[in-house]
Amino acid sequence: MEASWRQVAGGRGRSRGRATAAPSGNGVHLRGAGGGREKGSVGAVPSGTSPGGVATTAAAGSRHSPAGSQALQTTAASELMSQKKFEEIKKANQAAARKLVEEQFSSSSEEGDEDFEGKQGKILANTFITYTTQTDGDTRELERTKQYVNEAFQAGAMTCLICIASVKRNQAVWSCSGCFCIFHMPCIQKWAKDSQFLVSSVTDDDFGKKDCPWPCPKCRFEYKRSETPSRYYCYCGKVEDPPLDPWLVPHSCGQVCEREFKPPCGHKCLLLCHPGPCPPCPKMVTTTCYCKKAKPIPRRCSAKEWSCQLPCGQKLLCGQHKCENPCHAGSCQPCPRVSRQKCVCGKKVAERSCASPLWHCDQVCGKTLPCGNHTCEQVCHVGACGECPRSGKRFCPCQKSKFSLPCTEDVPTCGDSCDKVLECGIHRCSQRCHRGPCETCRQEVEKHCRCGKHTKRMPCHKPYLCETKCVKMRDCQKHQCRRKCCPGNCPPCDQNCGRTLGCRNHKCPSVCHRGSCYPCPETVDVKCNCGNTKVTVPCGRERTTRPPKCKEQCSRPPTCHHTSQEKHRCHFGSCPPCHQPCQKVLEKCGHLCPAPCHDQALIKQTGRHQPTGPWEQPSEPAFIQTALPCPPCQVPIPMECLGKHEVSPLPCHAVGPYSCKRVCGRILDCQNHTCMKECHKVTKTDGCTGKNKAGPECLHCEEGCSKSRPLGCLHPCILRCHPGECPPCVQMLRIKCHCKITSLYVECRKITTADVNEKNLLSCCKNQCPKELPCGHRCKEMCHPGECPFNCNQKVKLRCPCKRIKKELQCNKVRENQVSIECDTTCKEMKRKASEIKEAEAKAALEEEKRRQQAELEAFENRLKGRRKKNRKRDEVAVELSLWQKHKYYLISVCGVVVVVFAWYITHDVN
């Protein structure tokens, strides 16, 4: 059965798509299945309407018996149920639409958050399960790793510091191995490329080409050029382009991490592929203390170094005392004791730390050197003083002459020119050998300025700086050098960068530079409405980061008549509408209002300014909060319908006589149809009127008779709908006879009541059958059905094979091959003579052809021999003609006459 809304829309039966309404005496309008239906109507009548406008059922069988009425009532009940369900769904959809307009934060979001948190907890447990089994459930060492994993799950928690955009699950990323910060793959590739270009543009000119590293944008950890990321890998580096799996940590492969711990201990990480640093090694190893005195005990590999707290006892560097500190790692501390110690020269004694026994005083040695003339001028030192520095061979001041003199005499000058290179580095000293430094160079030379743009003649020792300012751009490529007489190696820019960072809140504090600025190092706390929950994000992300989901309960007072509002979490904006039952006492009936609280319902504002023309943009609809009155009471009260079909619960506000919208179903006077009116009141005028008997308010059947006709009769009953049997059909039928030539007119009742033989007689036209037999003669029978009988008695002529003898026989015997005519002796003699004549003609034709060919051959030979002389006689050949050649025409004509005479004689004799 179709749903009620589908039946209303399309209709069924003969009147589909046709709205019909039959006026009745009491003003009730009947609607067919194709017509419109009022809102709130129950069920659809699965019937059409007759041309007269009276409703009819879709099947005739359901009209004749009480079983049909029962089926109709069952259909109406099911349609009523479908219509009720449709109304319920419609109301639910309307309520959902109103709720979507009214609520800013629905409880479904909180349930979704709880589901997400539960799912996240399962993924975290699966990620850390292999680690927690090693640590007996202790997760204190996993806090830092948990923070990274939680940020990977939270939308907007992971931020690329280069583009200041959130990192999504389906984007290719790269993780720094130093600070474990996450960056977009295109961003970090561009960052590495720009960094290498900026460094290489400076170092290639000064130091030649070399492998330029590039730093991490956050921790400045340097990577080689070969370590520039080119492919997207998971956190552990095992899987390239890891697929997106909602049950795994984003950007992970789901396999065991197996990265080596830092510092390396020989073990590998047991967690599933994860972001952030690996936790400390949870393996158990047997190890001893630092001083090796205590017995080895099992400890975690990450905390395998331990102290037994006993005195160390190792001898210190002083060689006199032992270390008194508790068992410790590394070398022992210097000896803390103090003692009186001499300096290395032994002249002074002082109290000093025992850890530094060697020390120097500030006195000159003063010991007499081996020469006996001078004393040692070194400050307190260890060992012998050495030889006198003035002993042995010494050079003159210009280093050209060598002298062997006692240490008490000074080396004299040699008298030669000094010839030392002056401070200018170009000229040499022209004075004689002298003591002390050479004087400044005073020669005048053509000097170029430092930038190489100007020349000037001036003393060599004076520098020449022009006043031209350098216009080259500094390494920042923003500011000019502006230094006077710059040699080309412009100094780095000393101004502040001052560009606004990607966060749009701060400016770059670095020195002016090329390329992109480093990300803003500041962080900002994004808080919930109550401030109890916060999340720390990079500076600049606070404008696009959603506030964290606070699990605290909202503490705002209720705005409706209830004493307390429904519990819900902390949120921004106004609280969601109250959904508690109203529970106000209704004035009319005294029942409690069960509807949700409607003190602050959102109502679309009407009567606003209407645009005067198409040039004005229509304003958006505005909603205002207002208190609505309580809806009508919906407490169910049992009531019986007008037609006594059912007892249904009605809402309290609608208690009263009602129509159940079913079909009346009472049997009309025709005893064939039922009343198709909607449920209505029936008054009983006669005491014997039964419950199923139609009353004066029911319909009066105005349809034609729709009873089934006899087999073969296609004419409707000429009477209106009536009880009992229909009269016989007297319509004249036009039929073809068996031979399909003549049209006959017969009453319909004779055809429908006749048997096979009678029908054959009625269809016979009493004329000869016009059909041809297979032999070609016409059938001799009267108009008949079926195939014609094959009993042809017509006379046919039959001849012998030479066509000379002719006889007449019956057609059926000839077709049955019962009679045949053979040639006699006369026929054979005539055949023989005819064959002889043909042979003679063929022989004559052959001889004639031979003579013609002989004549052609002789003519050809004559042409080959050429012309003969005139006095020669031509050779003549006499050819004798045969008898046939001489008299052939005469013989042929005589033979023809003889054959004709003979044939005429034979034919005349046979007849």
Curated annotation (Swiss-Prot):
A zinc finger (RING-type) spans 160-220. A zinc finger (NF-X1-type) spans 269-287, 322-341, 375-394, 428-447, 455-476, 480-499, 507-526, 674-702, 715-733, 777-796. GO terms for biological process: regulation of DNA-templated transcription. Its main location: membrane. It is a single-pass membrane protein. Belongs to the NFX1 family. This is NF-X1-type zinc finger protein NFXL1. The gene is NFXL1.
